[in-house]
Design a protein with these regions (language model features):
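Hydrophobic residues in well-ordered beta-strands that form the structural core
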Residues: 261, 282, 340-342, 414, ...
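Conserved PLP cofactor-binding pocket of PLP-dependent enzymes
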Residues: 479-500
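N-terminal basic, amphipathic alpha-helical segments
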Residues: 1-186, 396, 400-406, 429, ...
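PLP-dependent aminotransferase class I/II
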Residues: 366-445, 451-453
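Short beta-strand-to-loop capping motifs
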Residues: 387, 463-467, 503-505
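Conserved core of the PLP fold type I
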Residues: 187-336, 348-363, 367
Length: 521
């Protein structure tokens, strides 16, 4: 809210608009005309929350006053008052004849009460909106980007009223909470007598450095089903697959190293590797795998240390690596002396016989990473890596320096789910349900005028919309729909008409109606 010292004498309320409802939807929030706050205060709070959650990034331009008034069904004076408050809070800046822009985080500090402004907010608003009524205005509105961080934050700020088409997780109602509760009780029961209700002491101390022994044995059996020859001694657990990927990167790489990545590929991995100081070498990814000629040329020119890839049910395309391509990738890795980090996050949704590089290579030059967030629960941060014997101690050391150990209670509960066959049966049910959802989503997408760039498979569809999906993502975000625009899946963030959809969360006709409306705008 605006500081008292900078507030106008009377709060400005929007005049009645006959056609407007009593409550105005604004994404995940609602503007209520009868609320204690003015509409301007509610609208300012809406944008302030988006900025602080990094759904609107530094440099992003806010909608024009007229566009925001139309979008939120309020008067222009209400929008002016809301932007005035954002200026006073130091969240945005007004640029003469250009509009309002999110300020850089380093300078985004709330104004102290009574602080002196170089330019009064009202005057800054006037200067910023002067061009809106000028016939010379021709520059298009630059949409605030949706990036990897925004997608992650979207997981924690999703609109409860809408499914999130851009997220990479299953809907909560698809998960089996009863199975998880039973597994936890099963783990704790042997340590308790009928009169003992205390938590066993073994769960109050650090766990084993490499991870719970029981889980590592269960994982070794699971990997054997995929043809990956890993002993329990070759497996190290982590706080989720993302943590496992980070451990491997820190253990094998140093800042400045070159890393081959799929293009398109997982946006979070690009951001993480860049943050660690690595040089990304994008390899075009097709239906059957990477462009082998491009990989060969990049390897010759840059001597990469690592290739990070998702062989099965690739994110974002849903495609899986062909057997012939897999053998050629391994040949190039041997020829150019780089290791391969295989991310098998979606293993539970894929056929066991799908070609995996780690199975073909026998864990000699490859490292396998997976987890359980996608199939059990995102909050159960249990992941693991399986590596060649000569790398295991190095990876354990990196884990110890970063997090010490991982929670034994959750690891043993996951082991129970594996040992009892509960996880396999649950995964079979999810795969069947996902197949039906995929069929419905594909029909809706095609009816909305989209086409699939790769054959639909697994959790994700790689959809060509025919228009700039970054603009689509911006427009639909205010309607409460979080999209995953194609640009975030390219290391260079190039413009894209593609978007990733989650088949489990795109069966709602309301989304496709909103999509068609935004695309035609």
């Amino acid at each position: 809210m605006q500081d008292d010292a900078l507030s106008p004498p009377r709060a400005r309320r929007a005049p009645p608009v006959p056609a407007a409802p009593a409550a105005v939807a604004v994404g995940a929030a609602v503007l209520a005309r009868s609320a204690a706050q003015t509409l301007a205060e509610q609208l300012a709070g809406h944008y302030a929350a988006r900025i602080r959650q990094r759904l609107l990034l530094p440099g992003a331009r806010l909608p024009s006053v007229r566009e925001s008034a139309r979008r939120h069904r309020v008067s222009p004076s209400t929008v002016v008052a809301a932007y005035d408050q954002l200026l006073a809070q130091g969240l945005v800046e007004a640029k003469r004849q250009r509009g309002f822009f999110v300020r850089d985080g380093d300078t985004m500090t709330p104004r102290a009460a009574g602080a002196t402004l170089a330019e009064p907010p009202d005057l800054a608003v006037h200067r910023a909106i002067t061009t809106e009524t000028s016939p010379r205005q021709s520059a298009p509105l630059r949409p605030p980007p949706v990036d990897a961080t925004a997608l992650i934050r979207g997981m924690f700020a999703a609109d409860a009223q809408h499914p999130a088409p851009g997220l990479g997780t299953l809907p909560p109602e698809w998960l089996d909470a009863a199975m998880l509760q039973t597994a936890l009780r099963r783990v704790m029961a042997p340590a308790r007598s009928a009169s003992d209700t205390h938590l066993p002491s073994s769960y109050l101390s650090y766990g084993e450095p490499a991870g719970d022994t029981r889980l590592r044995h269960a994982l070794a059996q699971r990997l054997a089903d995929f043809g990956v020859p890993a002993t329990p001694a070759q497996i190290v657990t982590a706080n989720g697959a993302t943590h496992a990927l980070d451990i491997v990167s820190r253990g094998l790489l140093t800042p400045g190293d070159a890393v081959l990545v799929d293009d398109p590929g997982w946006s979070v991995e690009f951001a993480r590797l860049t943050q660690l100081g690595m040089r990304l070498l994008p390899v075009p990814r097709g239906v059957d795998g990477p462009d082998l000629a491009a990989m060969d040329a990049l390897a010759k020119a840059h001597q990469p240390r690592l290739y990070v890839t998702c062989s099965v049910l690739h994110n974002p395309t849903g495609a899986s690596l062909g057997l012939a391509s897999a053998h050629q990738v391994l040949r190039l890795a041997e020829q150019h002396d780089f290791r391969i980090l295989e991310d098998d996050t979606y293993a539970h949704l894929a056929p066991a016989h799908a070609p995996r590089l780690c199975a073909l290579d026998g864990l000699r030059r490859t490292i396998y990473v997976s987890g359980f967030a996608k199939i059990l629960a995102p909050g159960w941060r249990v992941g693991f890596m399986a590596a060649p014997p000569d790398l295991v101690e190095r990876l354990v050391d990196v884990k110890l320096l970063g997090t010490l150990t991982t929670p034994a209670l959750l690891e043993q509960a996951v082991a129970v789910c594996l040992e009892q066959g509960w996880l396999r049966r649950h995964a079979d049910r999810v795969v069947a349900r996902l197949g039906a959802a995929r069929t419905r989503s594909v029909k809706l997408a095609l009816a909305a005028g989209c086409r699939f760039a790769t054959p639909p498979a697994g959790l994700f569809g790689w959809v060509d919309t025919g228009v700039d999906t970054e603009r689509l993502a911006t427009d639909l975000l205010d309607e409460g729909w979080l999209l995953a625009p194609g640009t975030v899946f390219h290391p260079g963030r190039r413009p894209s008409t593609l978007m990733r959809i989650n088949f489990a969360t795109t069966q709602d006709p309301r989304f496709w109606r909103a999509f068609e409306k935004a695309r035609g705008a």
